[in-house]
Amino acid sequence: MNFSSFIFKVSDVFKSVIHEASDVVTKADLDNANAHTHSLAVGLGIGIVLFLIAGLIIGYFISMKIMKRQLKKNPPISKDTIRMIYQQVGRKPSESQINEIYNRAVKQK
């Protein structure tokens, strides 16, 4: 047995294996598998996008709730801050002026 006859035998074996494999897996099976894979990928893509949108919406409302709670506990302006601003400009405000400005600032939130 020489090398060329060995190559021919190996190629015949490969041909028979490929022929048997093609009998087992038909074109319809491949099309069905491709369609299933495609629909799975589309469904997964839509699911990811929907979960991202839902996460953004839920995150927005949670962050707004936390922000409002923080502003209520620690307002950005206090009566002492208003007093200090008036003193920096060289004025001595009355308590009613301070209360009026503070109440307007709190209502604007």
UniProtKB/Swiss-Prot annotation:
One GO CC annotation: plasma membrane
Entry keyword annotation includes Transmembrane: yes
Pfam families assigned: UPF0154 (PF03672)
Location relative to the cell: Cell membrane
Membrane-traversing stretches: 42-62
Key word Transmembrane present: yes
Membrane topology: Single-pass membrane protein
HAMAP family attached to this UniProt entry: UPF0154
Family: Belongs to the UPF0154 family.
Identification of the protein by name: UPF0154 protein UPA3_0273
